[in-house]
């Protein structure tokens, strides 16, 4: 199955790219520049494409991103520290981000005679991000079936949608994902901050999976405090 992977350069999407490269036919990686503060993630997506020897498209939607104001990922708003499950992390929502990216990726896949588009949304995202939930995935697939009716049949492949990030780490190990060559931090500094929601979730996932985390964090201990606070 000829499949394009939406790849941010993060742990989840890079692991998915390696999975697709082994289990299907990887047609290429599609990344998006939407004005995100952690734009350095795109360098990791580019490196992934080079490593897997496939085409990499970086699609510039910064003009769209300018209209999606109010998120800590795009505006000069402090990225909150803490676990993803905390309500404070809602400030990191970019409205309709996945729907916009998927719609573009489906268009590319149809034009390139591909069979599927893969996205790395996962169970850990459900609390904060509505466009990462199973209902959204099912509805988007149904919408695209109508949008491309008579032109192309493109499947939406979301193998992690009901899995945890720890499950993704385990899957990444099976498919030899080089975790050190992935970027998760929303703050986009020299190293992972270790304090934002995605850093905390990343560190916790390695711990739960029983896999050594190769990541350098500016604050390597904070995640335990954040996880304990979440637990109660």
Swiss-Prot record:
Its EC number is 6.3.4.20. One of its GO terms (molecular function) is zinc ion binding. It catalyses: 7-carboxy-7-deazaguanine + NH4(+) + ATP = 7-cyano-7-deazaguanine + ADP + phosphate + H2O + H(+). InterPro entries: QueC (IPR018317), Rossmann-like_a/b/a_fold (IPR014729). Coiled coil: none annotated. Its cofactor is Zn(2+). GO terms for biological process: queuosine biosynthetic process. Keywords: ATP-binding, Ligase, Metal-binding, Nucleotide-binding, Queuosine biosynthesis, Zinc. Binds 1 zinc ion per subunit. Zn(2+) binds at residues 185, 193, 196, 199. The keyword Nucleotide-binding applies. ATP binds at residues 7-17. Pathway: Purine metabolism; 7-cyano-7-deazaguanine biosynthesis. Belongs to the QueC family. Catalyzes the ATP-dependent conversion of 7-carboxy-7-deazaguanine (CDG) to 7-cyano-7-deazaguanine (preQ(0)). NCBIfam families: 7-cyano-7-deazaguanine synthase QueC (TIGR00364). This is 7-cyano-7-deazaguanine synthase. It comes from Chelativorans sp. (strain BNC1).
């Amino acid at each position: 199955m000829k499949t394009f992977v939406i790849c941010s350069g993060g742990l989840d999407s890079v692991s998915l790219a390696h999975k697709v490269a082994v289990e299907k036919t990887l047609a290429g990686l599609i990344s998006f520049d939407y004005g995100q503060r952690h734009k350095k993630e795109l360098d990791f997506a580019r490196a992934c494409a080079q490593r897997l020897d496939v085409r990499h498209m970086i699609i510039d939607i910064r003009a769209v991103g300018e209209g999606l104001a109010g998120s800590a990922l795009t505006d000069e708003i402090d990225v909150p520290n803490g676990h993803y499950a905390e309500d404070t992390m809602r400030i990191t929502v970019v409205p309709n981000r996945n729907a916009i990216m998927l719609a573009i990726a489906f268009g590319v896949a149809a034009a390139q005679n591909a069979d599927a588009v893969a996205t790395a949304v996962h169970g850990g995202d459900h609390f904060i991000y509505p466009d990462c939930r199973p209902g959204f995935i099912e509805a988007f697939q149904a919408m695209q079936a109508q949008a491309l009716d008579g032109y192309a049949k493109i499947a939406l492949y979301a193998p992690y949608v009901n899995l945890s990030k720890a499950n993704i780490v385990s899957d990444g190990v099976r498919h030899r994902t080089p975790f050190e060559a992935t970027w998760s931090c929303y703050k986009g500094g020299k190293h992972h901050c270790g304090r934002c929601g995605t850093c905390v979730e990343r560190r916790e996932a390695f711990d739960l999976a029983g896999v050594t985390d190769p990541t350098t964090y500016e604050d390597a201990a904070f995640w335990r405090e954040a996880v304990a606070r979440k637990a109660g």
